[in-house]
């Protein structure tokens, strides 16, 4: 039950945060971006926990790719299949289907550098997760 509450809270924070970033950046958002943001924040939290011993830069790289894949999926569903025209990156260099492009992947990387420590802070504050920057070295069995 605690996990459901944690996921619900993280989804809500991510959804509101993602929509907020979009409103600041584009002065508008769409309900699908709240859903995408919630999913992305859950994924980022999972990446943060699984890659706990890795550098923040590596975690941010993986996170940026994950967010980009979520954007691609949502773009295909909402922009291409349902023709809702939520966004269109067709004019951006090296775009794929007008749904994703390297510039926004780079921006997600930069944002992830802040979002990942924020997720760690929330994990510690709200859920009592101990956060180590690096994994403890394994102790040798031979002494």
What are the residue ranges of the model-derived segments?
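Aromatic-rich, lipid-facing transmembrane alpha helices and their immediate juxtamembrane interface loops
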Residues: 1-143
